[in-house]
């Protein structure tokens, strides 16, 4: 196991106990987190994501990753986050994981949960933690995932990993949007029923090209996902009831975010989209402490910002991250003024405390 705190994106650090953010240093010589898209497919059909619509069927080769690994080790990568889509659909997924383990790099898998039962033994063998999508209680989750028995397959998968016996941290992540904002408390109960270790909530990104949305969404697609002005008071009521009824879950951090953060990052976000508020200021050092490598080799500073280059076309990842253009872009980046950053739903505020990396 690595010293990286399990799934740093979900670890809460209260303001009174915060250490400073990891510094925004240029050139980048230490990169604790690397987010990797192993392939371009998904086994769900969610309304808030278009990855499943891809017909490219691309995937990163194990030989390519093995060639890049020595440099990633030199950059101090502590954790690789295997994202998607559904990373478990990669044709040689476990060879990828074997390479990361051999390099001493911890593994986080972001999964729909559909294939977890099939792969339970190897998930327990290779992975430090698993983050599963949970969109609500059974009926809501199945409707949003738009495939038969999605919730049931998720439940079977979590149970199968638990049954292996090795302790693996399993988190849930819920994207709050029009189809589920009324059932946040029920989502917490569902997370308990599934024996998840924690549940996190975030708003839906409707503004960028991320998640296979070249050119972005038109107004009709945005309206399917983003809350309307008339729905905002109902969201406020649900968050208030959640704070009132889930006090213990907030206190012991079963719910990853504090009540105040949920109001800032979800309610205020949708208020801002409707012109009722400003977007909440964010604290983020993602472009300095992490990077995203997509299936076709595209390298981004985070999920949402434009590409910095392509790893297949460059001599190294460092050459991309530390090019004159990339350094100039980071030095000019003001996360509270940049249009993409202001609307970000998934910022990263990475700190180091007690020898571990934590988010918060």
PLM feature spans:
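Radical SAM enzyme [4Fe-4S]-AdoMet core and its adjacent flexible, acidic
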Residues: 1-4, 8-10, 103, 126-129, ...
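Flexible mid-to-C-terminal extensions adjoining Fe-S/redox cofactors in radical SAM and related proteins
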Residues: 1-30, 52, 276-287, 292-360
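Conserved alpha-helical substructure of the radical SAM core
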Residues: 2-129, 223-235
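Amphipathic alpha-helical recognition patches that constitute DNA-binding helices
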Residues: 33, 37, 171, 205, ...
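Conserved residues at the C-terminal ends of beta-strands
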Residues: 52, 83, 133, 202, ...
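Short clusters of small/polar residues that mark proteolytic maturation junctions
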Residues: 53, 92, 203, 303-304
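Flexible, active-site-proximal loop/turn residues at the rims of small-molecule/cofactor binding pockets
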Residues: 55, 86, 136, 205, ...
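Short glycine-/acidic-enriched loop or helix-start segments at secondary-structure transitions
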Residues: 92-93, 119-120, 141-142, 211, ...
């Amino acid at each position: 196991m690595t010293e990286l705190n399990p799934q740093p994106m979900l670890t809460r650090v209260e303001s009174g106990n915060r250490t400073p953010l990891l510094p925004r240093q240029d050139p980048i010589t230490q990169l604790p987190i690397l987010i990797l898209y192993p392939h371009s497919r998904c086994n769900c059909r969610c309304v808030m994501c278009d990855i499943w619509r891809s017909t490219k069927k691309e995937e990163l080769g194990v030989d390519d990753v093995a060639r890049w690994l020595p440099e990633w080790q030199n950059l101090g990568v502590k954790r690789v986050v295997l994202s998607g889509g559904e990373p478990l659909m990669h044709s040689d997924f476990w060879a990828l994981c074997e390479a990361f383990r051999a390099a001493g790099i911890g593994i986080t898998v972001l999964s729909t949960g559909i294939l977890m039962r099939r792969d339970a033994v190897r998930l327990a063998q290779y992975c430090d933690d698993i983050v599963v999508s949970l969109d609500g209680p059974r009926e809501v989750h199945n409707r949003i995932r738009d495939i038969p028995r999605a919730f049931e397959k998720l439940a079977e998968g979590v149970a199968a990993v638990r049954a292996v016996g090795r302790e693996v941290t399993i988190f849930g992540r819920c994207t709050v949007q029009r189809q589920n904002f009324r059932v946040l408390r029920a989502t917490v109960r569902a997370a308990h029923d599934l024996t998840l270790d924690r549940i996190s909530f975030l708003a839906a990104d409707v503004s960028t090209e991320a998640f296979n949305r070249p050119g972005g969404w038109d107004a009709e697609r945005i309206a399917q996902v983003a809350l309307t002005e008339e729905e905002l008071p109902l969201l406020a009521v649900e968050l208030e009831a959640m704070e009132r009824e889930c006090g213990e879950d907030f206190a012991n951090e079963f719910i990853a975010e504090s009540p105040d953060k949920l109001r800032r990052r979800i309610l205020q976000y949708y208020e801002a989209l409707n012109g009722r508020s400003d977007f909440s200021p964010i604290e983020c050092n993602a472009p300095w402490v992490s990077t995203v490598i997509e299936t076709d080799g595209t390298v981004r500073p985070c999920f949402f910002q434009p590409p910095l280059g392509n790893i297949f076309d460059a001599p190294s990842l460092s050459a991309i991250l530390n090019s004159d253009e990339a350094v100039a872009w980071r030095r000019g980046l003001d996360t509270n003024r940049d249009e993409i950053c202001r609307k970000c739903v998934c910022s990263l505020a990475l700190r180091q405390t007690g020898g571990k990396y934590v988010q918060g």
